[in-house]
Regions:
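Active-site neighborhoods and metal-handling regions in enzymes and metal-associated proteins
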Residues: 1-221
Length: 221
C-alpha cells in the first residue's frame, strides 16, 4: 500500500497502536504457569474491546487470534495447552485490522532472568530491527534493510532465518512488496517509495538459517 491521505495515515496509526497495545499486554501476562491458549483468549478479549479483527484468523482461518511461538518454534505457533516455563523464549505476533487498515507487530523475549545467551538473541533481533529501519527511506534499495540486519547478526556471531521475510501491508495483511529479505541479495534492486507501508521482520538465529515445517500441524515453523 502507498499511504497518501490523512485517512490512510490515521487508520494505519490507529491499528498500529492497537496491535502494539495488545502485544505489550500479552508480554506482561506471560508468566510461568500460564498457557499460550490463555494468552490468546486475552488477545481475543482485547480485539473485541478495541473493535479490531485478528488478521490471521479472519484472513487465513488460523486456529488462534495471535501466533505464539515458544523455544524451538520460530513462527506461526498455535496457541494451545503449552505451559510457559522459566527460561522459555517466547515470540508473540499480533496482526489485526480495523476499518480496512492492517498492522503487524511482534516481539521475542525470555521468561525470567539469568539467561544471557537467550537474552542476547532477543536483543540482537531488536537491534537489527532498528538498524534496518534506518535504511528505510524513499528511493533507497529495499535490499539495504536486509543487508543491515544480516551484518549486525554476523557481528554478534549469529545469522538470520533466510526463508522468513517482511512484506508490504496496509489494506490487507500481505501486499507488495512480497518479500523484505533479512539478508542482502544483489538481485533485489527494488526501491522503496514514499508512503510505502511495510512490515519489517528480522528473524535472528544462533545457528540455523532454514525453517522446518512442524509435523503436527500445518502452521508452526
Amino acid at each position: 500500500m502507498i499511504a497518501k491521505t490523512e485517512a490512510d495515515f490515521n487508520g494505519l496509526k490507529e491499528i498500529g497502536r492497537i496491535c502494539g497495545a495488545i502485544r505489550d499486554e500479552l508480554v506482561a501476562l506471560t508468566k510461568v504457569g500460564i498457557t499460550t491458549k490463555e494468552l490468546d483468549n486475552r488477545a481475543k478479549e482485547l480485539f473485541d474491546e478495541y473493535g479490531a479483527l485478528s488478521a490471521p484468523k479472519e484472513t487465513y482461518n488460523f486456529p488462534g487470534y495471535t501466533c505464539i511461538s515458544v523455544n524451538e518454534e520460530i513462527a506461526h505457533g498455535i496457541p494451545g495447552s503449552r505451559v510457559i516455563k522459566e527460561g522459555d523464549v517466547v515470540n508473540i505476533d499480533v496482526s489485526a485490522s480495523k476499518d480496512g487498515y492492517f498492522a503487524d507487530t511482534g516481539v521475542s523475549f525470555v521468561v525470567g532472568e539469568g539467561y544471557p545467551e537467550k537474552e542476547k538473541v532477543c536483543q540482537v533481533a531488536k537491534d537489527a530491527f532498528y538498524a534496518g529501519l534506518e535504511k528505510a527511506k524513499p528511493g533507497s534499495k529495499k535490499s539495504g534493510l536486509g543487508k543491515a540486519v544480516h551484518n549486525l547478526a554476523k557481528r554478534n556471531g549469529m545469522t538470520v532465518i533466510k526463508e522468513l521475510t517482511g512484506h508490504g501491508i496496509g489494506r490487507s495483511i500481505h501486499e507488495a512488496p512480497d518479500h523484505i529479505f533479512n539478508y542482502f541479495s544483489r538481485w533485489d534492486d527494488e526501491l522503496l517509495k514514499d508512503g510505502m507501508v511495510i512490515a519489517f521482520e528480522p528473524f535472528i538465529s544462533t545457528k540455523e538459517e532454514s525453517i522446518i515445517q512442524s509435523t503436527t500441524d500445518d502452521w508452526t515453523l
